[in-house]
């Protein structure tokens, strides 16, 4: 676990009610957020500044490579960037920082382009920088906006085959 404190996750979303597509709603709970078809704008934790698990901080400091993703973008990947001690440890780390985008745009990020994944990171934690962004071929071909946005995060883009087989899950 990233924290020894029990945490609740919430998300600000739009598009939940088709009759009010621009109205914002707050959803709570990992399962609820993961299943929503609304557009997730922002996620948060309660408590908002939990202490990080000491073993997590030790692992970050001892790492040669830090890999964020793939996974459910808003409920598995982003929460790590909402714990201030974890963010500080990542920023202070000399490890190579690697961001792996999902192999498809399914689930919470349905309709998200690869650049949008990077924008979400920057919106939630503007100080975050990466050395490398890995993108699955087929999820993104040559994409000048993706390459440009990756450079703003300090990253070099690598587009390659990342899935071992045809999968429908964005995690594999």
What positions do the PLM features span?
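Electropositive, gly/pro-rich neighborhoods at or near active sites that engage anionic ligands
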Residues: 1-37
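Charged helix-capping and loop-helix junction motifs
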Residues: 80-87, 113-118
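An anion/phosphate-binding loop that grips the pyrophosphate of nucleotide cofactors and donors
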Residues: 63
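Short, flexible loop segments at boundaries between secondary-structure elements
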Residues: 94-107
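C-terminal functional extensions of proteins
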Residues: 111-172
């Amino acid at each position: 676990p990233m924290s020894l404190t029990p945490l609740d996750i919430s998300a600000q979303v739009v598009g939940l009610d088709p009759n009010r597509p621009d109205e914002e709603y707050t959803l709570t709970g990992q399962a609820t957020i993961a299943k929503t078809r609304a557009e997730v704008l922002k996620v948060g934790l309660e408590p908002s500044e939990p202490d990080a698990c000491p073993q997590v901080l030790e692992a970050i400091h001892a790492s040669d490579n830090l890999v964020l993703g793939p996974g459910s973008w808003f409920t598995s990947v982003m929460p790590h960037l909402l714990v201030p001690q974890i963010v500080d440890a990542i920023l202070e780390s000399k490890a190579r920082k690697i961001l792996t985008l999902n192999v498809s745009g399914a689930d919470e990020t349905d309709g998200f382009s690869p650049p949008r994944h990077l924008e979400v990171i920057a919106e939630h934690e503007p100080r975050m920088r990466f050395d490398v962004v890995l993108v699955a071929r087929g999820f993104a071909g040559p994409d000048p906006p993706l390459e440009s946005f990756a450079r703003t995060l300090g990253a070099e883009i690598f587009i390659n085959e990342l899935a071992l087989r045809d999968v429908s899950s964005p995690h594999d």
